[in-house]
């Protein structure tokens, strides 16, 4: 029976081509198509439900820089800072008043963040610790008036002395009062200067202040924003074009901002940071619009990583160097004058929040070294202060992330306000926050068993097919190689069979008498084609064998 060499060759070749095309072309396209149909913000989908009401809290950490030498700093000395924290909160995110536009393939919603103190995770801290910070109303207010409304300085200075009697440049208060419960602002005075100062509270210009009665307000960094509207977004649903999933097209019902000098900086780029499109390329980066900064920030690919045994991509970001990057000059006060640009690694938030605040990475990580040298107590490092995201590109899933941001006061002396006239000019760290998420196995298993299991099966299948096809190709090549020698091999086999037949037909020799001497003569065998079997040339055939009887 002959082996079908041609069929084996063709079958193995076809298997090899199929493994390549299916494993690297067809299957990935099928998988991407299935993901694109599932990962949308269409009502009724699992992704829509998870996106609109996150079923687990994010971890929110607050670290405060306690000023240990406030009196010396008030006289121009170098600040000494002590980091206190973390104060831990559970941050719940939800979206309400959702409105779909099927024609535009968008959904509009209001974002709401709710912070709940986690005393167990905060231990040994309690939140009742007293912290010394730059006065959160006097210093920003005095600096803003000096820069923008210097003619009103005398009126403001008198009003501050009435609303905050005996106030100093630095305020000592409990952490929870500073950040959530609020510090008291007394606007009960009938003095004209006090009433003029309190106007900004009554009109709502001070967004961090909450009115508790007709004459009193409570000011806190985050209390007013807790469980309140964080802005109305309009984003793409990704039904018609999956690549636009989550893309911000409007914020506060505007298609672009009107904050920065140049239009490019006012453009919305990326998502609302709670959802990303699947199938991104690593060089695309991860872009998100951040209302707190009135700016879109992009994270860039750093290196490969893994999370719970699943491969992912590590992304990171920083504030960049606005002065050195021409594309970022629109974040300068005057894009034509680079001297108005903030230092490397910082961003001026005055146009965004209306006060002399600067944003940076914690501890001025990746910022101008001079900023670190201006104060004592900072120790920037990548592990604790870098922003990172471990992201799975195909499904668009962030496995874990840490968004870190530091808020600083752009401090300077104010001649018209007595407690502030000798302050040093520097960028003063106040506090920094970290918003983190680490998906547990309940959610990572959804990706693991729907995506990575399919990828693993495809990998095993395609490499198995390639292995079998290569074995088949090698075996068929072996058969074709020996095809030219088949005649010689057949002849040899036939002659071997002839020799066996001749040997089997010989008559047996008569038994020898042990008492007689016997001479054995060789039998003449016809010459064969097998070399070495010709008796005429074999010396063994001339040997004479004798048996003698022993007595």
Curated annotation (Swiss-Prot):
In residue numbers, the region (Disordered) covers: 528-551
Q: Name one GO biological process term.
A: pupariation
Q: Which ranges are annotated Polar residues under compositional bias?
A: 528-540
The record places the following residue ranges in the Extracellular compartment, namely 29-459
Q: List the disulfide bonds.
A: 265-330, 294-352, 332-341
Per the record, the similarity remark reads:
Belongs to the CD36 family.
What's the name of the protein?
Sensory neuron membrane protein 1
The coding gene here is Snmp1
